[in-house]
Amino acid sequence: MEKNATLLTEFVLTGLSHQPLWNIPLFLVFLVIYLITIVGNVSLITLIWTDPHLHIPMYLFLGSLAFVDTSISSIVVPKMLLNFFGKSKVITLSECMAQFFLFNISATTECFLLAAMAYDRYVAICKPLLYPVVMTNGLCVWLIALSFVAGIIHALIHEGFLLRLTFCNSNMIHNFYCDIISLLKISCTDTSLNYLIVFIFSGSIQVFTISTILVSYTIILFTILKKKSAKGIKKAFSTCGAHLLSVSLYYGPLLFMYVHPASSEVDDQDMIDSLFYTVIIPVLNPIIYSLRNKQVIDSLAKFLKRNV
């Protein structure tokens, strides 16, 4: 680092658009999406919390996923909305680190929750008689807690290695929130160790959770194909379809960000991918899991009947 270099304590989030003309339309679009996200996920959590019939592992996992999706959206979107009308779009170093830390906890937790949900479906479909014994509420709560603990540990590791960095080359973050790759790009400290940590820990989490999901659903697929009952096959596919769609939507952009070559030309693509799993997926998940779920729809009907 140069002796006369000025250490930066504030950054500028470039955001989604450099055209002021687009600020109001984009603000309105993302405000509506955010409100739908909050209402949808909080409603799902409320239904699961208040209806004793939904106090089973499948819905406890779903409620936890809704909580994490709400967190991801709330960590990123409010600041993004403010920046549509902010002249400077500044975020301090401490705010940036806090945002990344909380986002990392939520994103990592979601990975482990999706893997746990895949295991839950595996036991339910492949070992239905043992399901009440194997997948108890106690085990479910333990898996949920473990997912959050893993998220916190993962975030602490990255945060610890980020704190050793200094920033003096540029204060422009080419994104709408503070993500680790954007921060590493503008550091004037050697970031080789940080990239290695990202590769080892984030890569291991992706490999472990995706492998768990793939193995679970491969076994589920073979089990379904062995079923002679058309009704049983339809029910099994209906049960797993929502989760598979959610997994595909979440891991697709995430994996693409890891495999494409690094260059300045892909900054916009990175931003689109980030937008997908920080804004779009949190609003889609409650819709995906609720629209074709009879128990959730019935519970909603009862709730509205009691309270409206």
Swiss-Prot record:
It is found in: Cell membrane. Keywords: Cell membrane, Disulfide bond, G-protein coupled receptor, Glycoprotein, Membrane, Olfaction, Receptor, Sensory transduction, Transducer, Transmembrane, Transmembrane helix. Pfam families: 7tm_4. InterPro entries: GPCR_Rhodpsn, GPCR_Rhodpsn_7TM, Olfact_rcpt. Residues 49-55, 114-143, 219-238, 292-308 are cytoplasmic. One of its GO terms (cellular component) is membrane. GO terms for biological process: G protein-coupled receptor signaling pathway; sensory perception of smell. It comes from the Eukaryota. The keyword ATP-binding does not apply. Belongs to the G-protein coupled receptor 1 family. PANTHER family: OLFACTORY RECEPTOR (PTHR48018). This is Olfactory receptor 5H19. It comes from Mus musculus (Mouse). The lineage of its organism: Eukaryota, Metazoa, Chordata, Craniata, Vertebrata. The gene is Or5h19.
